[in-house]
Amino acid sequence: MSSPDSPTVVTLEAIGYLRNALATRVEAARQPRAAAGAAARIELLPGRNFEHALEDLASWELIWVIFWFHLNSGWRPKVLPPRSTTGRKGVFSTRSPHRPNPIGMSAVRLERVEGLNLYIRDTDMLDGTPVLDIKPYVAYTDAHPDAGTGW
């Protein structure tokens, strides 16, 4: 059992890796919607029955990619978002990659699935990014157009 003094340790394994031409953070868009058209491929690891896990995914137009910000070192409790006009914000109120657990998520356009490869567009991830999970984007539950924004 965990407590505030001894948090639960969680171990994750990558299910695959993102492949594209973006090698450094300055090359990538800050958000997937700002990366319109940016092509990439998710290469899933062989020998784990992922072929079966991919069944029916090709029928979805958008998917969520859950990933690890593998180039980050450390985290910051306060960050300066690019659009902030009022200074630093608590990291949990931002989309900053500098988090206690550097987990990211991006909604990307799924072009096609071929074997263990998912061809995607509109991605803000870098080459070699470890992919932790893939989920379909379900508009009626994932979109909240009436939601307000903070700051």
For the regions a protein language model found, what residue spans apply to each?
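Glycine-rich, low-complexity intrinsically disordered segments
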Residues: 1-107, 111-151
